[in-house]
A protein has these predicted regions:
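Thiamine diphosphate
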Residues: 1-169, 173, 308, ...
């Protein structure tokens, strides 16, 4: 058993290295992914070891990067595309929505598009405009895409491998402020399904559901609530499309209460879909309305204000208290 403690950034690097090493059809493309190793060094050393034909520095043109990846996928390759920052994905949105997500259905299933689009996302790093956004709901809304986000190093390692092996396009959101968080990774493990939610803390009074960067906050909230005698269950959703509603439903029907937490704005966020589905499925098990905690319906603020914008421990605990007060 090969168990090693590593950061999310290191786990992603090792997973990408494994993909390149085991499948000659895997390519990595993006701005500064080669010689520089990416702005977060996720692809560090890969061009040196696998060559410029497989780890490709591209022009600053996201639409062209994704369009090229689509063409390569049609020719039998498995491209992994890096979008340097979350706010830079929008020039490629047309290619992703009108081509990448739809070609399989358009061709009646006769072609596959095994493309992974990596997107470092979210705030918390004191960045400038266009560098701290959480646009995952825009992609989860699009049929034909898988949309996932790991919260820890083990999931980063294994979910990336599963994404690369998928014959469907995967939008892989990486929580950039968690890149340096470390945890154990078992590289010989047998991972669960890519879309499957995981219970990361057992509880009986209320369910917290989160993904990506907010899982850590929810675990901290559950630990704080425990000191006051409140038993909080925490689910790591892992996948925003498809969503593992069965696991969420089972937890909510045990606890009777649900709070959904994400960094993206609450308005039209993934939490709204989860709240609606659980209300439809488990209405008579609910002891309180489903509550949501997230960002505000406003452009992401300057770095000096982001701590006020980002949902943190206090806002999660406030929602927990409001739910338990019903």
């Amino acid at each position: 058993m090969a168990v090693e403690k590593m950061s999310i950034a290191k786990a992603l690097n090792e997973s990408l290295r494994h993909a390149l090493d085991t499948d000659p059809k895997v390519l990595i493309m993006g701005e500064d992914v080669g010689k520089l190793g990416g702005v977060f060094r996720i692809t560090d050393g890969l061009q040196k070891d696998f060559g410029e034909d497989r780890v490709i520095d591209t022009p600053l043109a996201e639409s062209g990067i994704v369009g090229t990846a689509i063409g390569l996928a049609l020719r039998g390759y498995r491209p992994i595309v890096e979008i340097q920052f979350d706010g830079f994905v929008f020039p490629a949105y047309d290619q992703i929505v009108t081509q990448l997500a739809k070609m399989h259905a358009r061709a009646l299933g006769k072609i596959k598009l095994p493309v992974v689009v990596r997107i470092p996302y979210g705030g918390g790093i004191g960045a400038v405009e266009h560098h701290s956004e959480s646009p995952e709901a825009l992609f989860a809304h699009v049929a034909g895409l898988k949309v996932v986000s790991p919260s820890n190093a083990s999931d980063a390692y294994w979910m990336m491998q599963q994404a690369v092996q998928s014959d469907d396009p995967v939008i892989f959101f990486e929580p950039k402020r968690r890149y340096w968080d470390k945890s154990e990774v078992d590289t010989d493990a047998i991972p669960g399904p890519l879309h499957k939610a995981v219970t990361v803390r057992e509880g009986s009074d209320l369910t917290l559901v989160a993904y990506g960067p907010m899982v850590k906050v929810c675990l901290e909230a559950a630990a704080a609530a425990q000191e006051e005698g409140k038993s909080i269950e925490v689910l790591d959703l892992r996948s925003m499309s498809p969503i593992d509603f069965d696991t969420v439903q089972a937890s909510v029907e045990k606890t009777g209460r649900l709070v959904v937490v994400h960094e993206a704005p609450v308005f039209y966020g993934s939490g709204a879909e989860i709240a609606a589905r659980i209300t439809e499925r488990s209405f008579y098990h609910l002891e309180a309305p489903v509550l949501r905690v997230g960002g505000y319906h406003a452009p992401y603020p300057p770095a000096r204000l982001e701590e006020e914008y980002l949902p943190g421990l206090d806002r999660v605990l406030d929602a927990v208290d409001r739910s338990l007060a019903y």
